Amino acid sequence: MVMPLALLEKSMNKKISLLLKDNRVLEGKLTGYDEYMNMVLEETEERTAEQTRRLGVVVLRGNNVVSISPLN
């Protein structure tokens, strides 16, 4: 099993997908994080069942994240 902070370290400056507690999905380039898993994403898009929105730079509180997946 990969530890979350190790995955974030490997994913720096790469695209990731985040599933949030409210079932939204954010996809963007990880440009920063801290020990609480708060993250900074650039070129971020929010995906819901109905639509996709471009958000740009997002600062995300770590406790809102359910899962983290690297994108190729």
Spans of features found by a protein language model:
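Conserved RNA-binding domains used in RNP assembly and mRNA/RNA metabolism
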Residues: 1-72
